[in-house]
Each structure stands twice: as C-alpha cells, then as structure tokens.
Amino acid sequence: MPAPEPTPDLPIAETLACPVPPEQRPLEQYRELQQSWFFTWPHASFKGLAVPLVRSWLIVLPLTMLVATGSVPLRHNLPRLVVAGAVAGLVVPLLMLLRQWLGWTNLQKRLMATAVDYEESGWYDGQVWEKPLAWREQDLLVATHEVKPVLERLQQAMAITAALMLVGTSLCQAL
C-alpha cells in the first residue's frame, strides 16, 4: 500500500496569487471607511460622533419648526410646537446613524467571512475566493478591535436618539 502524500501546511489559496482586485478587499474597504469624512465620525470616540449629529440636528431644526407651524393646533401651543419640531429634527441624525451602521456592519461581515466575494469586470461575474489563513487572522483582528467598538458606539447613539424621540413624543402628548 503506497504511503499517502504529505499535505502542505498552507491551503492552496495561500500559494496562489490573490485574484481579488485591491479595491474590493475587506481591509481596503476598511481603510476607505476610515478615511471617509462621513464614516470616520464614530471611529475615534463617542464625542467625535455626537458633535456632527448635533450639528446636523441644529441645521435641520429651523426647517422642522417651520413645517410644524403649518399645524393649526401646534401654532396656538408654543411649547408643543417647539417639542414637535425638535423631535422631527431627530429623524435626520437617526437616518445618518442608520447609514453609518449599515456601512460598518457590511464591512464587519466581510472581515469575519472566510471567503471574499468579488467581481472582476462587472456585476454578472461574481466570484468567491477563499481567504488565506494570514488574511483571515488579520481581518478578524481588525473586525474585533477596530470595527466592533465603532458598531457599539453607533448602537449607543441610535439608542440615545430613539430614546430622545420617545421622550419628546411623550412630552408633546403630555403638553
């Protein structure tokens, strides 16, 4: 009986050149999100996320107040008008948080995956390439230590925004 051939320590994918275009690799996507002016807000700290959200709320607040004045019952009740306009203004920051959360969640899924989906020339030729072990380890480290804290900050911010909306809506009903 012949002896079995020794199996190499490295998977075949590690010995082959990477067919995934550089711009479609998960780590490159991480670098792009990290350098983007919009997606970098939650990356550094919670304050780095809160300041632009408050600014966006303050920018949209006059518009929501103007729209709220279109309601006859609110026009005659100033405190209720202010609260309704403020609550309506929270929709924009909440949508911004949702967009950021979707982008970072997609990145985390790609980093945690054992294979990379990519397209060489267009939408019709989707390919899958198994990540080498070294890539998987590096991607897992980035997903765990860089992306996970960002997602936690975004979830906290969304919870705070939703709570503010609920409190504001309750206050508006109480007035």
Regions found by a protein language model. Give the residues of each.
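Membrane-proximal soluble regions of multi-pass membrane proteins
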Residues: 13-38, 100-145
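Long, low-complexity intrinsically disordered regions enriched in Ser/Thr, Asp/Glu, Pro/Gly
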Residues: 1-9
